[in-house]
Curated annotation (Swiss-Prot):
Record-annotated membrane-spanning stretches: 6-26
An annotated GO BP: proton motive force-driven ATP synthesis
Family designation: Belongs to the ATPase protein 8 family.
Membrane topology of the entry: Single-pass membrane protein
Protein name: ATP synthase protein 8
Assembly with partners or alone: F-type ATPases have 2 components, CF(1) - the catalytic core - and CF(0) - the membrane proton channel.
Disulfide bonds: none
Function: Mitochondrial membrane ATP synthase (F(1)F(0) ATP synthase or Complex V) produces ATP from ADP in the presence of a proton gradient across the membrane which is generated by electron transport complexes of the respiratory chain. F-type ATPases consist of two structural domains, F(1) - containing the extramembraneous catalytic core and F(0) - containing the membrane proton channel, linked together by a central stalk and a peripheral stalk. During catalysis, ATP synthesis in the catalytic domain of F(1) is coupled via a rotary mechanism of the central stalk subunits to proton translocation.
Keyword S-adenosyl-L-methionine tagged: no
This protein's record includes keyword Chloroplast: no
């Protein structure tokens, strides 16, 4: 049964690690949460109430 050289295992590990990181980055950055407009309006009003008018 043939055996792989250590550099073969290293290159295989590096290739799969890069593929795993790219896959996770694509999944992370493709997610866009949807916020209803009513919540967006309430959020802007709540931040405006924090600005004190001295």
């Amino acid at each position: 049964m043939p055996q792989m050289a250590p550099i073969g295992w290293l290159s295989l590990f590096i290739i799969f690690s890069i593929a795993f990181v790219i896959f996770n980055m694509m999944n992370y950055y493709s997610y866009t949460p949807s916020m209803p407009k009513s919540e967006l309006i309430n959020k802007t009003q709540s931040t405006n109430s924090l600005n004190w008018k001295w």
